[in-house]
Amino acid sequence: MKYLIFIGIAAMALACAPDKPKNQEQYPDQPTKSVVEEIIADPTKGIGAVKKVTLKTPLEQERVGRGLAIFEMKCSACHRLTTERVVGPGWKDVTKRRQPEWVMNMITNVDVMLDKDPEAQKLFELCLVRMPNQNVSIGDARDILEFMRQNDGAK
């Protein structure tokens, strides 16, 4: 009787075991960490999915409004719109010092940027606090960038 119970439990455990690890099943097209590690940081564009950003003049006011809302919700606790450093650096003139691709990659790919990008590492040394990953989409990062451009005086 004990053997039958043991065999029954073992059979159920084997039947419920997955064939593949879940991450391969759900995300087959996602690059592995070794692929990400091979990416060399472009000092002007950073590391991430954003390779080229086309900026328009005049500013896209809808994007500016959405960027302001995202800033207030996810960024304002650590960043100011002036040069004042709170937890993170102030945002004044960021778009004059950095390429738009770098800004967007820093927002959307912060962990890799802080680990591998020399400019992001300098900011980390200055602030001594890692910027948390806010899970900002590329579209939302573009809206934040447009808001930052307005903050820096772009028209």
What kind of region is each of these model predictions?
Residues 1-14:
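Sec-dependent bacterial lipoprotein signal peptides
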Residues 16-20:
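Bacterial signal peptide processing site
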Residues 23-70:
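Electrostatic cytochrome c docking/interface patches
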Residues 63, 71-74, 82, 130, ...:
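Short pre-active-site segment immediately N-terminal to redox-active cysteine/selenocysteine motifs
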Residues 64, 68, 79-109:
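Gly/Gly-Pro-rich "capping" loops immediately C-terminal to redox-active cysteine motifs
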Residues 79, 111, 148-152:
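Protein kinase-like catalytic domain
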Residues 86-94, 111-140:
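Axial heme c-ligation environment in periplasmic c-type cytochrome domains
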Residues 101-106, 129-155:
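C-terminal capping alpha-helices of c-type cytochrome domains
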